[in-house]
């Protein structure tokens, strides 16, 4: 068992933001604002893991702030791939999902990434 902090995935995004296609097409400034806000929040968590853990601990009964803070410190919150870099990372994940039979064998990883990735922050 591994995670995305080791091996070939060590420098890949661990999370992506899915935004409804109509929002991207019809209200791109809103999609861009949501994306920018999430990136700002990621940076804040990375810079303030103890405070973030204390805030989140109030919403869970399964972990304390003291348990959560080290988890937050281990995450790659400073990694924000955009456009071509994001597409490459998504294609890598898609290939792995094919190998695990989550995606159909006919799914083209590059084509999948091209279809689902949109850089809403691009001018």
Please provide the spans of the model-predicted regions.
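Pocket-lining segment of extracytoplasmic ligand-binding domains
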Residues: 1-58
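An extracytoplasmic/periplasmic, membrane-proximal ligand-sensing/linker region
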Residues: 51-123
């Amino acid at each position: 068992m591994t995670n995305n902090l080791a091996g070939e995935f060590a420098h890949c995004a661990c999370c992506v933001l899915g935004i409804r296609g109509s929002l991207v097409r019809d209200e791109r400034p809103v999609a861009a604002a949501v994306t920018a806000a999430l990136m700002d929040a990621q940076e804040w968590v990375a810079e303030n893991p103890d405070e973030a853990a204390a805030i989140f601990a109030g919403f869970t009964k399964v972990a304390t702030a003291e348990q959560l803070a080290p988890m937050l410190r281990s995450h790659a919150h400073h990694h924000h791939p955009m456009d071509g870099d994001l597409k490459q990372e998504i294609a890598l994940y898609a290939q792995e999902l094919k190998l695990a039979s989550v995606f159909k064998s006919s799914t083209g990883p590059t084509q999948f990434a091209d279809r689902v990735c949109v850089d809403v922050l691009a001018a």
